[in-house]
Regions:
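Conserved kinase catalytic-core segment
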Residues: 35-51, 97-163
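Cytochrome P450 core scaffold surrounding the K-helix E-X-X-R motif
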Residues: 83, 163-165
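Mobile late-domain/C-terminal helix-loop "cap" segments
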Residues: 177-190
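Generic recognition of well-ordered alpha-helical segments
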Residues: 88, 157-163, 175, 187
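Conserved ATP-binding subdomain of kinase catalytic cores across diverse folds
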Residues: 1-96
């Protein structure tokens, strides 16, 4: 759900409203609905690990109740009450299914070279953390005020291996060195 939240007042309203009221922050809420796994708590712990590892992510938190914990993250596509122009890798290159294609797209649109480290960190963390939901809609680019494209903060970084699913479901969506499983350090560095 998209909402605008004022934590000081304990208030929120629909994020579909174009401009948030002063003191409200545009956020995305993921509700604690999974019966078998504490998915929102897992996503929050992955957020903390990723930030500690130097990955740029939007500020996030858990909203805990007696039996629930909802995950909230600030929206990166809003700045000062206005929409920020973004494009996913899927929008720029629909058939993109590899990290190589991600890096090629970033270079093609002129992302500053230093920001490619963000993409590399995310690739490594997706492999190490078991985030196999790394499809081309989970990588975005922002148009800066300077008119240049920039790597968007990472999002949807969480453990996504399903222990009850067939093995082929638990492969990475994007290939690394033509592999979706059994990815090695050599594959990451090639």
């Amino acid at each position: 759900a998209v909402v605008n939240v004022n934590f000081g007042e304990g208030q929120c309203y629909s994020g579909q409203v174009a401009t948030p009221y002063p003191g409200y922050t545009p956020m995305i809420v993921k509700f604690d609905e999974h019966q078998k796994m504490p998915t929102t708590r897992i996503e929050y712990s992955y957020y903390l690990m990723a930030v500690d590892a130097g990955l740029q992510m939007m500020p996030s938190r858990l909203l805990e109740g007696e039996q629930t914990a909802h995950f909230l993250t600030e929206r990166f596509d809003r700045r000062n009450g206005k929409k920020v122009h973004i494009q996913t890798l899927a929008a720029m290159n629909p058939p993109a299914d590899s990290y190589e294609a991600l890096f090629e797209a970033a270079c093609r649109i002129g992302v500053p070279p230093g920001e490619l480290r963000q993409l590399f960190r995310l690739m490594v963390l997706n492999v190490l953390g078991g985030n196999v939901d790394d499809h081309n809609k989970n990588f975005s680019f922002l148009m800066g005020d300077d008119g240049r494209w920039h790597v968007a903060p990472a999002y949807d970084y969480t453990f996504s291996v399903d222990p009850d699913a067939p093995y082929y479901v638990n492969r990475h969506s994007m290939t690394i060195n033509n592999r979706t499983e059994g990815i090695t350090a050599a594959d990451l560095l090639e």
